[in-house]
């Protein structure tokens, strides 16, 4: 079993290394000793060793790179846990989807039902029978974590909260959340209401990727409603300028939970901490995980969406060659200092390629491997545009050519 190091150990190691370094004030004050031994030769491709992740006081947790999806560290990440108000990440996803496709508008007025008004737990203080704009309810849910605002949104989109929960589960299925099931929109405890740290991280990544126009709501520090100032419960928003979301959660049975995203120098990380013993513990754990990821890893973009990777000959086609590439940006995350060792290999799934090909048709695979040969990513190669068949003479000539291929 790998021993986890406390977050303070990283600072201590750095201090000792600095004090011992030639030219440091401490080293200069030390009496001269024997001549230092020559350094041990290190291969140029070797990276500094990556230490164990920091010790985290929580039931389960995960650290994931947003762009590559690589898990940098985790503990019991697939264990079922109560999500508490992290449930509202999926509520937000469903509402954002309704906004994006025009079924809902930010200015739509939602009538507050008695069911929403009587919601237990945290509140936005909306009153039964009043009409409240959707954009205010979104802030009430995301910033204040109000259960009343959350249920009002669920009823506005789904008709009833029960019907909305079915929509949540369908989106969970589409996003590949294999350890998640919802029975309500706000996260109050129920035996059939559960998730996992990995699923929460996957959902957080989907929110950032699919709804960049709405994601800034998660960084709103406070807002006013009914002359009540309502603040964001995510304390890291005020402590780390790179943190720009996502959501807190807490019930007595779930403990203190926090899903966090931060962006530094183009690298975005997502951490999820479930079942911490206190607000302080969940924030310290999240900060330590993010610091670990940014200190010891880096993410690079290897290919851009629709970038041509191969231009193979296409038989029986109107044009002799076709552009084959990747359908989306390709990223990988490696230990710092190892980016130069990353290699890519493009391989067609069958040869020769014969027209017609449709745009987006899968024709191969791009493999990404590190210096040791370990495969990091597998990305489909697709036809970047349609390749129609050529004329009768072209098809006849290539039919003969294929006999000798």
Residue ranges and their predicted role:
Residues 1-4:
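Positively charged n-region of N-terminal signal peptides that target proteins for export
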Residues 21-211, 222-226:
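Active-site-adjacent loops and short helices of periplasmic peptidoglycan-processing enzymes
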Residues 177-181, 189-194, 198-405:
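Domain-terminus/edge residues, biased toward the C-terminal soluble/receptor-binding domains
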Residues 10, 52-54, 74, 262, ...:
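Sterically constrained small-residue positions within well-ordered secondary structures
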Residues 7-17:
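Bacterial N-terminal signal peptides
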């Amino acid at each position: 079993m790998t021993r986890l190091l406390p977050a303070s150990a990283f600072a201590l190691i750095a201090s000792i290394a600095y004090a011992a370094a030639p030219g440091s004030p401490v080293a200069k004050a030390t009496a001269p000793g024997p001549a230092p031994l020559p350094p041990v030769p290190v291969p140029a491709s070797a990276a500094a060793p990556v230490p164990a992740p920091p010790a985290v006081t929580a039931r389960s947790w995960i650290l994931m790179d947003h762009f590559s999806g690589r898990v940098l560290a985790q503990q019991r990440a697939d264990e079922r846990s109560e999500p508490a108000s992290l449930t509202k990440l999926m509520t937000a996803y469903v509402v954002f989807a309704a906004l994006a496709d025009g079924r809902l508008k930010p200015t739509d007025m939602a009538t507050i039902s008695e069911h929403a008004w009587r919601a237990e737990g945290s509140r936005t203080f909306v009153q039964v029978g009043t009409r409240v704009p959707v954009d205010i309810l979104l802030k009430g849910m995301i910033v204040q974590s109000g259960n009343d605002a959350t249920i009002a949104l669920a009823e506005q989109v789904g008709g009833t909260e029960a019907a909305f929960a079915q929509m949540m589960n369908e989106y969970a299925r589409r996003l590949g959340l294999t350890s998640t099931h919802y029975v309500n929109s706000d996260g109050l405890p129920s035996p059939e209401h559960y998730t996992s740290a990995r699923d929460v991280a996957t959902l957080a990544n989907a929110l950032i990727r699919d709804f960049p126009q709405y994601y800034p709501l998660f960084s709103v520090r406070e807002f006013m409603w009914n002359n009540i100032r309502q603040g964001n419960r995510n304390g890291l928003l005020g402590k780390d300028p790179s943190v720009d979301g996502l959501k807190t959660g807490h019930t007595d049975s779930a403990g203190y939970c926090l899903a966090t995203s931060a962006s530094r120098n183009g690298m975005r990380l997502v951490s999820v901490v479930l079942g911490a013993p206190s607000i302080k513990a969940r924030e310290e754990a999240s900060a330590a995980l993010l610091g670990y990821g940014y200190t010891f890893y880096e993410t690079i973009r290897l290919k851009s969406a629709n970038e041509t990777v191969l231009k193979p000959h296409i038989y029986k086609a109107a044009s002799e060659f076709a552009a084959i590439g990747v359908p989306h940006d390709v990223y990988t995350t490696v230990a710092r200092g190892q980016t130069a060792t990353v290699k890519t290999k493009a391989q067609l799934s069958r040869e020769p390629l014969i027209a017609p090909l449709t745009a987006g048709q899968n024709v191969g695979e791009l493999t990404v491997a590190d210096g040791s040969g370990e495969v990091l990513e597998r990305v489909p190669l697709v036809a970047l545009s349609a390749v129609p068949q050529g004329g009768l003479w072209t098809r006849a000539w290539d039919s003969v050519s294929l006999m000798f291929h």
